[in-house]
Amino acid sequence: MNSISTSSKKEIYALVDKVVNKYLQKAKNSPTVNSGNPFVMAIFQDFDPILHRIHGAKTSLGSEMEKIAEIIAKDAWGKHNVRRKININIKLPENVFRTVDNIINNLSNAKKLSNYSEEKKKILEACKNPSKEMESHTYEFDMELYDEANNHWYYLEMKGPDPNTTEVPGAKKRLMVEMAWAFFKNNYKNVDSLFAIYYNNKYPKPYKNPKVLYYFDPDGGLLVHDLFWNFIGKNNSTYTELLNIFKEYGKKNKKRIWDGFSKLIVKT
């Protein structure tokens, strides 16, 4: 049985089509627009406009992956158990925030590698022994999932394979704070926070981006490539199904895409 429903497949197809059409239209309206990089242009001269548009389309598709994850998750977890882009004002004891900051500082200073189980235990202990002083901060979270069958909550941050240096510790803090908030404010017993990388750009080699692995434990709290998509879809075939949707789109629209982009090649 497929994990991605027919209706969800159509939604994903429409998102991809929207991005492709956007860049085909840009190619038609502004065929001479280039990267603006004189060094790249000097090397690739005749091909820079097409490379520029393809790079833009790739970036825009990356921005749609969170929406695609939400579509798939609603199939697997139920619409009422999925929330995305949530803004929450979180009020926690001061010692909980200090615990989170200490964990991040130790990782930032490379004093130790991330150990998800140990970090989770420290946060839970801080919540069980709260200080009187409270702090309040507002955060935006990428996704919240609730597993009704097991009464288990999951909080996720989702990035591409090479997030910038400031994004990773920021995501780490948000995930730990949200997990603490779930323990302390809502008294949830089963909670996990997960950092998701939606594809491994070195596949089939292991994912080894040091910017990420300094802060996230591959043995807990980190989902990469097929592990992420299969988790979201609650099915070991989800990643393959999703990839096949993209392949099918590419095959059906190959001529249209080539006709639109090939006109950007400057013939000299």
Could you tell me what each predicted segment is?
Residues 95-96, 167-169, 203-208:
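A short acidic (Asp/Glu
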Residues 154, 182-213:
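Nucleic-acid nuclease catalytic cores
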Residues 3-23, 203-268:
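Non-catalytic C-terminal interaction segments of nucleic acid-processing enzymes
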Residues 85-149:
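Active-site metal-binding core of divalent-cation-utilizing nuclease and nuclease-like domains
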Residues 160-183:
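Mg2+/Mn2+-dependent nuclease catalytic core
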Residues 1-91, 267-268:
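Nuclease-adjacent, charged terminal/linker segments that flank catalytic cores
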Residues 54-56, 126-132, 158-166:
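Surface-exposed cleft-lining segments at the edges of enzyme active sites
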Residues 73, 141-162:
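Conserved catalytic cores of phosphodiester-cleaving nucleases, focusing on short active-site segments
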